[in-house]
């Protein structure tokens, strides 16, 4: 019988691995759409940004969501107002570290949602 290392949460590890795989797929898909990769899993106080991309001169903060099926709603619907606020805060802090702000940098918030085999790209899904 396999043992889970002390202090490790196996289901949490699997969730992280699954999330990383979908984020990588979203990155490749967005690059195929012409966006340029900047960063992944940018952690700031209060939140994490899955992907930061560039679409021309626009900085794009991307939230990636996955649901196996739409039984309880599609993946895009899981980006709650609370999650949006955390992403806005994280993006504001990330921009500040880059010597920018929402006032000086053209940016938007996109959601790439995988529900089963379907992909949905919601450009400018929310904002401040």
Swiss-Prot record:
Instruction: Please provide an example of a Pfam family that matches this protein in its UniProt record.
Output: UPF0102
SUPFAM superfamilies found in the cross-reference section = Restriction endonuclease-like (SSF52980)
Using the UniProt annotation, give all residue ranges assigned to the region (Disordered): 1-20
Q: Name one GO molecular function term.
A: nucleic acid binding
Output the superkingdom of the source species: Bacteria
Q: Tell me which PANTHER family the record gives.
A: UPF0102 PROTEIN YRAN
The text of the family note is: Belongs to the UPF0102 family.
- This chain belongs to the protein called UPF0102 protein KPK_0567
Q: Which organism is it from?
A: Klebsiella pneumoniae (strain 342)
